[in-house]
Curated annotation (Swiss-Prot):
Chief location of this protein within or outside the cell: membrane
Glycosylation site positions: 135
Name of the protein described by the UniProt record: Protein EI24 homolog
Membrane-spanning intervals of the chain: 53-73, 92-112, 153-173, 175-195, 225-245, 260-280
Membrane topology qualifier: Multi-pass membrane protein
GO biological process annotation, one example: negative regulation of gene expression
Upper classification of the organism: Eukaryota, Amoebozoa, Evosea, Eumycetozoa, Dictyostelia
Organism of this sequence: Dictyostelium discoideum (Social amoeba)
Amino acid sequence: METFKEYVTKRIDNTIPQVKEMFKLIWLGVADSMKLKGAIIRTIKSEVLRKNFIHCIFLNGIIFLGTYLIYLYWVSPMLNYLLNHFPTLSNMFTIIYFSLWVYPVYIFSIIANSKWYTEIAKESFVISGRTTFANSTNGILSSFVDEIYRNLLFGVILVMSAIIAFIPYTNFINFVIITWLYSFWCFDYKWILRGKWNLLQRIQYFETHWAYMFGYGLIFTTCSFFFPMLIGNAIFSILYPLFIILSISAKPTKMVNQDGILPKQIPIFYVPEIIVNVILKLYVKYKNTRGAAKSTTPSPSPTTKQN
């Protein structure tokens, strides 16, 4: 029977080939995400893909990003020069410009992009020779619940990322989190269209393929992460359709060597899941308390009309 020391030594020795396999899987993910030529060719050949991708470029690249860059590098410096002695007026113009143009366009782009991304994913799925799963009534209800939980989960992750960004020397941690999140967003369309897995199953699959998934999202995140928020989001919105298209034909690989100290599965979404579950429990408790309070409130007695 091996001692604890022998067990630890064996695990450490087996970690070296495991690390090599990890970097190999990361590179496979990077390589699959760099096949942009194939995604562009598919986009050009398909009318649906081409139309929706042009919409994404026009809205995000020209209307939103273009006008924002014009303001940032032309209008704003000119205003600062002209209103050098009236900084209050310059600040007022900035507030008005962002309130009436930048943020409304940004919100509209989020809504429009969601529709276009879905169309792009569906068409890519069909082009790849796959067929979508026909949902039953129970399946539709389950998908609706999944979608609510999914949006809450992503919202919590983004809030956590924003909080981490304010902590010194955590930029790398934030980059890793966003890389995994972007990668999940790319593949989630494919998994939803298959219709075979619920959200928790999709998360489990993602977490057991953590090395490949990190590699797949690495280039995508690098292209937008280091820019200011609005510019980075615009770049993300332009590139995202291409990475969705590539994810449809990608074949993620998980780590085979389990004898080292590297984990088989990294619980990437563990903390956000706990927070979402707490939020949902508090909401249900609040609704139940409110419903009980309403049921115990006496109804007003009817008044009698006197002649």
